[in-house]
Amino acid sequence: MNIITWLAEPNWTGGVTETLDWKTDVLQSPTGAEQRIARRLSPRRTFEFSILLADNDRQRLENAVFHAGAARWAMPVFSDVYVLPEDIAAGGNIITLDTVGRDFSAGGKLLLKDGLAMNARSSLIDIENVTSDGLNLSAPLAERWPAGAILYPVRHAVLTDPPDFTRYNTSLSAAQIRFRVDEHNAFSDDIAALPRYRSHPILEPDSNWSESVTGQYLRLLLELDNGSGLVARTDTARRPFVMQAHTWMPFGRDEQAALRSLFYFLRGRQRAIWVSSPNHDFYPVSGMNGNVIDVENAGFADFGIVPGRRDLRIRRTDGSCIYRRITAATVLSEAVERLLLDGSAISLEIDDIESLSFITLCRQESDSVEWQHTTDGDGLASVSTTFRGIRDELESV
């Protein structure tokens, strides 16, 4: 059977959920040392959305699903929609548009539609190559397409499950649709814009506070319990591992493309990145003129300096950041303790310091990332993940 084009538009009241799934083998010792091996060249992608169809649209979709439910579909990437601002004449083989952040690929396909209905005029067109400002088509357009026509990148995909239709009456139905992209999913992993510290990138900006940020200090505990005596417990790593949730709400195609590049760099659980605590971990009581800063006594010096809690981000009020390692800490009084930092001297007035926060070398806790497209890529999305601390002294730092 030929590939069938999916023509039913999503119901955007619930958005479109895109899931990126990497596969990583994490070989962890009882001490927390890790070897991480990526098993996929690119992530598997799934798209999930709801539809609400009536009358002829419902009839057309149910006929298509009945006959081709197990086949490969030409699935429009709905979050990368583009509306033609002007007419395109028949015979042309170039479509001018901003392709950055849109899922076009050389040798791939695009879908042109002259409306939202399933019976609207549509055409599946081959792409020869992609530039930053347009698409070169494999053959000239056979028809004229007016301003307002809709253009989508297309991916070959399969339905992961048969749609379960909810029938509200004789002509109106809803269903939840889930596609899995059935081809390689390449994307740039360039994160050169991010700062670096000790050979690894640093995650910026901070988590979005539209919802509470969660965290914990995970221990690798081994318990022996014979059921009658006391339980014997061993902390095999003899240190905690930070677990830190992080949420982004990127707006616009540039922010979303940069965030996608970050996830492609991280490759699920494989690669490491420095992640800042969301807290003000110290309150300064002095400025800096050298490598020493005095802070309110937070009990840090009492426990000593240990891996995983010795690297500091100093954020200035202008938004710029300085990253340093704490090399010594001493208690000056009940109210003040002093931190000695490595690196070059720093000159800062106390009013120039916005926050002092720990940073921890982390990897993602999961290989799966959910990307909630609230609107198309020119608007708002929401993405959340959880980072897990690793033993930075054993990484290449």
Protein language model regions, located:
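Polar/acidic, low-complexity leader/linker segments enriched in S/T/G and N/D
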Residues: 1-21, 182-214
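N-terminal low-complexity, intrinsically disordered "leader/linker" segments enriched in small/polar
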Residues: 6-70, 77, 242-248
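Short linear interaction motifs
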Residues: 26-33, 157-161, 221-232
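Oligomerization/assembly interface segments of phage tail-like spikes and tubes
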Residues: 36-55, 165-187, 233-252, 371-397
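Autoprocessing Asn-cyclization modules and mimics
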Residues: 52-143, 188-190, 196-209, 253-343, ...
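Short solvent-exposed strand/turn elements
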Residues: 132-158, 164-185, 333-359, 384-393
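Conserved small-residue-rich
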Residues: 199-252
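Low-complexity, acidic Ser/Thr/Pro-rich "mucin-like" tracts of secreted and single-pass surface proteins
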Residues: 232, 287-291, 297-299, 349-377, ...
